[in-house]
Every structure is written in C-alpha cells, then in structure tokens.
Amino acid sequence: MSAPEMSKSKPANSHLSTGLDEAKLRAQVIEQSTREPSPTRAQLAVRHRVVLSIVMLVPLLIFIACGGIRVGPRPDGLVLQTALGSGILAAGLAILGVGRGRSMLGRPRSWLLLQVLLTPALLLGWRVLISACYPQMMVEWTDRPGLRCFTLSVILACAPLLGLLWLRRGSDPLYPRLTAAALGAAVGAGAWVLVDLWCPVGYVPHLLLGHVLPLLLLIATSALLGSRVIAVGRGSAPLTGR
C-alpha cells in the first residue's frame, strides 16, 4: 500500500512547486514594475511627437537633396492643382489610417480596408484627371519609364514607415496586418505627394510603374510586417502610461 500512496503524492508536490514558481515570478514582476515606474501619457505623447518629427523630417531632407520641386514643362496651375489635391487626399487618408479613432482598439476593419483600397485609386485618378485637362501633359517620355520615381518613392517612405510601425508595436489585438497595411498606405500617400512635385511626367504607364507600384509594395510589405511587429504579444509592446 505504501507504493501507490507515494505515487499519488508526486503530483501534489509537482503542483506545489509550480505554484511557488509562479508566485515567485509574479512577485519579481511586481517588484520590477514598482522599481521602474511607467511613463505618463504626457511623456509618451512627447516621445511620439519627437519620433514622428524626426521620421517626417528625413524624407523632406531627401526630397530637397534630390532637387525639390521640379515644375519642368508643366504649367504652374497643373503643379498647384495636383499638389493640393493629392495633399488633401494624403492628409485625409493618413488621419483615417494612422489615427485610432475613439476606440482604443483602433479603426473598424471596414474603414481600414476602404482606406487601403482607395489610396492608390484616388491618387492615380486625381493625377490623371488634372493632367488630362492640360495639352501635352500625358505624352510618353521615352527616357523616363518610371524607375527613378519608383526608387525615390521607396526611399522617401522608408523612415516614416519604420517609425510608425515602431510606435504602434505590440498594440493591435484585432487586425494587425490590416492596420499595418493602412499605415503603409498613409505613408505611401505622403511619399506620392513629394514625388508628384518632383516628377513632371503624366504618362499613365509611367505613373503605374513609378508611382502606383511602389505604393502597392509598401502596402504589401507593411501587411507582412504587421503580424510580426504590431500584433499584441509581438515585439516590445508600448507602455500605456499612467
């Protein structure tokens, strides 16, 4: 009878040991949290503004280094209309894609999906619509197929995209891929505005290769990174503050 009694006592000892380990771990976590207090929401807001300012300044400096605004053969009215229209669209899409709205869980899934789908369509449609109103503004440039615009679009978007993903790391419990895709669309829209000011070509195949394709790649890349970076439990989750 002693052998069975000994075998029955082993699970009890095992559960007791596990419980002690969990209690010890919990005590260590509580002790560490009290020793290293989390920053306040105001402090977090300041940090976020600093990071955003830096990552937004980088593409502007690159844009200036690459020549800045190049009117070229375009009429001033065309440049002004395309820049204003795409700028307003990019700002609205950024508010929709980057902002969380009233819910701490972020935008509804339908809003994010709509923003991702509409971003390339609206920006391309506006550029083509305005260019078509001016003669000779949609002709082919044989020496400008769109590769330089493609490269510039990607370079301009890198720093803002990485910065936004870092700020939103470990924060989305519902749709991390779609949220990240919306961030990529918002960043790509901002890069589109700068490239529009830099590029005088309105030829549709050029726009598809040099302007639309990098935007689509940014959206796809962001979606792939979403599950690894901004999903809850991935990476280092941002502190909520006090």
Identify the meaning behind each predicted range:
Residues 124-178:
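Membrane-proximal helix-loop-helix units in multi-pass membrane proteins
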Residues 42-140:
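Selected alpha-helical membrane-embedding segments in polytopic membrane proteins
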Residues 75-82, 111, 138-150, 178, ...:
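Non-cytosolic membrane-interface motifs at loop->transmembrane helix junctions
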